[in-house]
């Protein structure tokens, strides 16, 4: 646990250094791994890690990063058949675990597989909205920042016909 905390702090310090001193952009995933249902949500733990490197109050530390949420949506999920296969194996084979080869196949398919139309959209920097959260207790603060980032990402999504079909199927309409 201590080693993981030290590693997170080192990563956070480097991200702050890269942005504030080297004037570089950093793209970081909002969560570890991928959600099987593609409903990715920002993990509070990612924000806690990012806040570690600022060396002061959480809001100031996050504002220093000039966070700009970005949405990436595509028409087809190239990994859909792999996700379905994994879900079926988990259902049918007790104790099933994906192998490292399975993970590599998923990554390769996700990167190079056919996606149809692809849409990328950035929102505006959320610094002003972060300022409005100043004063919240830490226990609530990270959850609210996660919700804020998710809201901006969801507003940037482009929906394709398959999304509407899936919604109809889920709602039984």
Question: Where are the regions a protein language model picked out?
Answer:
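Membrane-interfacial terminal anchoring regions of lipid-handling membrane enzymes
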Residues: 2-26, 32-173
